[in-house]
Regions:
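Short, solvent-exposed loop/beta-turn-alpha elements that line the ligand-binding surface or hinge
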Residues: 56-61, 258-262, 332-339
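Conserved C-terminal helix/tail region of periplasmic/extracytoplasmic solute-binding proteins
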Residues: 2-14, 352-406
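Pocket-lining segment of extracytoplasmic ligand-binding domains
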Residues: 188-310
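Short, surface-exposed acidic
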Residues: 61-69, 172-179, 284, 315-328, ...
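Secondary-structure end/capping motifs
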Residues: 279-358
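Extracytoplasmic/secreted proteins, especially bacterial periplasmic and envelope-associated proteins
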Residues: 50, 54, 95, 99, ...
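Short, glycine-/small- and polar/acidic-enriched structural segments
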Residues: 4-192, 236, 394-406
Length: 406
């Protein structure tokens, strides 16, 4: 436990170089005949596809092997956070890819999925005489602090961002409360105990781990329960419900209740990113991934109950029904809408202003909609050919011609 410290963005070139000298950041040799994927345990088409396998089928059509990051024992967990594999595609929380693109290496933003009304909540002990944010004046609010300099402190970023937003929405500032930091090693990413055996599917990670009740994903709950702090930020309604189920905690503020959508940016929207090397040298690999995501996303949108049963294996909703309620209004087809790009920009600006990244960049230049557009076009052309094949002597191809249809 420590008092709040002011951050300065680290020199990532130096940190990465030192990590390599120490024998860290081991990764498989580059082979463009295989693509690795990695994702976070959140709402995404990729997490649904773990059970469908449709993206793997798309890659088989072009003779490329599609593998989960940890399906190869040569890879540790760091590529999920710092993209140190040229041939990896990541679908996960927003803050790590922002950090990578700003300070480590150039990447391409291929698409996002946003879960609206998930800005986070403020939690206190259920029997404390605290019912409003104003009651926290002079009280202690916890803040996680990763000591791992190789990757970004995404837990701490979302907590700090959420705390500041809640204070502001209640006419308060950081001066009204005491922010207490909780440093932790955060050094498991190449730990031998976390490295084996290899996993073909990300959901295998949870076969021996009860993630819905694992306090590693609610890092400040113990400190709050023991009275070391008076309040903690919880990333979303999802995690707060798990805390409330214990009967020990309650929520006194929820950013989801406000009409302002710019408050709903707790490490979201989830972002799809690839390296610029993949995008420029092998664009078909990025397009193929997005074809899979579009197909799976459309299926999930049409079969929300089935998608909920799959996602419940990996996400932090209480059960399948709770998962269904969480995804009922979510569009699982990735997009790069203007509104979602603004949400990305909000996250980036917070990281820059608070010393989590050193370099600024233009989110609209980071986004590359041509890959999503090409994937959608290829799927549409294929569907058109399927539907017209039985009705026309020669399959029409309207999308590639300049002629008018109708």
């Amino acid at each position: 436990m420590a008092k709040e410290t002011k951050r300065t963005a680290p020199n990532m070139d130096e940190i990465i170089a030192n990590a390599k000298k120490e024998g860290k950041l081991k990764a498989a040799p580059l082979d463009w005949n295989e693509v690795y994927y990695t994702n976070c345990p959140l709402i995404s088409a990729s997490n649904v596809d773990q059970e469908l396998g449709w993206t793997k089928e798309e890659y088989k059509k072009i003779g490329v092997q599609y593998r989960y990051l940890r399906d190869n024992k040569e890879n540790d967990w760091y590529p999920h956070y710092i993209h140190n594999l040229d041939n990896i595609i990541r679908f996960g929380g927003l803050f790590p890819p922002i950090h990578v693109h700003a300070d480590i290496r150039r990447t391409v933003l291929l698409g996002v999925t946003h879960v609206a009304k998930e800005g986070g909540v403020m939690m206190v002990r259920s029997r404390d005489d605290i019912y409003r944010m104003e009651d926290l004046k002079g009280k202690k609010i916890g803040l996680s602090r990763s000591q791992n300099k190789i990757k970004t402190d995404w837990w701490g970023i979302q907590e700090e961002q959420g705390i500041e937003m809640m204070l502001r929405m209640n006419g308060m500032t950081r001066d009204d409360v005491e922010i207490v930091e909780f440093p932790y090693p955060d050094d498991w990413y190449d730990n031998p105990e976390m490295m084996g055996p290899e996993m073909e599917n990300p959901s295998e990670l949870w076969l021996k781990r009860d993630h819905k009740n694992d306090l590693a994903f609610r890092p400040l709950e113990t400190a709050l329960g023991n009275g070391v702090i008076d309040a903690m930020y919880s990333q979303s309604r999802v995690l707060s419900v798990l805390s409330e189920t214990t009967g020990k905690f309650k929520s006194i503020e929820d950013l989801a209740r406000y009409p302002d959508w710019t408050l709903q940016v707790a490490n979201i929207p989830a972002a799809i990113t690839c390296t610029v090397e993949m995008a420029e040298k092998h664009p078909e690999l990025a397009v193929t991934f997005l074809k899979g995501m579009i197909k799976v996303g459309r299926w999930a949108n049409e079969h929300k109950q089935a998608a909920a049963a799959i996602l419940d294996k990996q996400t932090f909703y209480r059960d399948v029904e709770d998962t269904f309620e969480g995804i009922r209004r979510v569009d699982l087809v990735p997009n790069l809408s203007p509104q979602n790009l603004v949400s990305v920009d909000i996250g980036k600006d917070f990281m820059l202003s608070h010393g989590y990244i050193k370099n600024d960049f233009d989110v609209n230049e980071w986004a590359a909609p041509q890959f999503l557009e090409q994937a959608a076009r290829e799927l549409l052309e294929l569907e058109w050919k399927k539907r017209t094949h039985a009705k026309l002597p020669q399959t029409a191809d309207p999308l590639s011609s300049g002629g008018r249809v109708g």
